[in-house]
């Protein structure tokens, strides 16, 4: 995560030596791993469990951590001094590859296969893992939209139209992601674009005499916007007893759903006012 997105407060008074220096290093490593998991979409229980396993593996029994959906608090008793760390971690995007890599690293650390100094280098490599290229993301969005339009009862014509919708949607999402637009605004604009392109495709296909279903095209197009990961992660957090984080994620999913509904509804309402346009 970029420096201007991180607000932290690490405190270890004085000049730690011996066991205190090691405790400080373990604290930083555990927080670094937890930060990587959380900002890439990891569940709360997974973040906390991973951090505790890393601390125990390096002999820090006095390690404690409290994790929320967008931040974590950790401390370790290094003997005469108490090290603490606070991180504000807004989630940028889900990256399952990084989550899997951190999980594999934590298991290797727990098995005693990774030295403390080497672990920092491994974490840096994980954080440097690239995201998918824009072209790949755009193609995946288009194909996914087409497949879901067909799965929800649409025809091959509907699937082809949904493919065009998906290919138009992902570039907008990438631009809004780079501009750091809010999640509500991004999904509102994305849903509006889906409805507009779907309506345009339906009118063009109708003019060509091809039968199509506008609702199936829209359904396929909005599937990439549906907050499935946030919803399932929230349920997992609640099942694990973390009701606060689970509720926050559930509220986040509801707000995204509202944004999608508002975006689609507004465009369809405007489209219905245009003479000659059938909604």
Label every PLM stretch briefly.
Residues 1-114:
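Soluble N-terminal domains of membrane-associated systems
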Residues 200-279:
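Generic detector of multi-pass transmembrane helix bundles and their immediately adjacent loops
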Residues 131-205, 213:
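Core alpha-helical transmembrane segments of integral membrane proteins
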